């Protein structure tokens, strides 16, 4: 099986490529840079076949995917700078990448009859209430530009293809990129006390674990919508920060604050990012390990 992976310079794309190699599959990576520009850790992705591609260039996407002729495309590339996406001068570019770029990928998948995996987000929902969001819920009300464009990408995929997996994730962390854990470790070295919000609730997603699940999924034809974060219960960012410092051996004191008290963010964030993942088990997929276990392994990976 040959798999074309977009966004390999990012956290998830990096881990998907390496997971494919560990199972004997051929992964072809792509990103915007002329050559692989992610972390140089000596893993498979750093030397694998790579194609430079601007996903907003419809003709280039079609030609590249027809040439590679993959069985599956795992589409990890996206604009993910949530606050920056609110700037008026950035919004056309955000849409071009997250909506139009995804449409280009979907059109090419249809042309070569490839399965497509689209990575989406809890931000397609409005985050109201306390009940976990179901994967097949269509009550979309994104609160910010990023969420609106990721929803646009979902609709592009579902309206174009029948052989698709839309996988929503949240609170992502991985080796190859910036994330909340790295931020906490950095600021925890500089400050004795920190303020972290305690009214946004969800579950983290370790890209190493998610990559394994995604390869499990593409080995099947169990198409549709899935939610995939680590197990271990729903938590706040405050809870997460406390556990990060505990496991890392930091003495940093964390003070809980509300989102309103914290301020600073341009983009509105959902309060309820609880994602129901029971559909994974119902379809025979193994759930991700607990986020506490994932954090412990990740800290070792960073060491």
Where are these regions (language model features)?
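N-terminal Rossmann NAD(P)H-binding glycine-rich loop of SDR-like oxidoreductase domains
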Residues: 1-23
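Glycine-rich Rossmann NAD(P)(H)-binding loop
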Residues: 6, 196-201, 226-234
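NAD(P)H-binding glycine-rich loop region in Rossmannoid oxidoreductase-like domains
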Residues: 55-97
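Mid/C-terminal beta-alpha module of Rossmann-like enzyme folds, strongest
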Residues: 190, 213, 220-265, 271-272
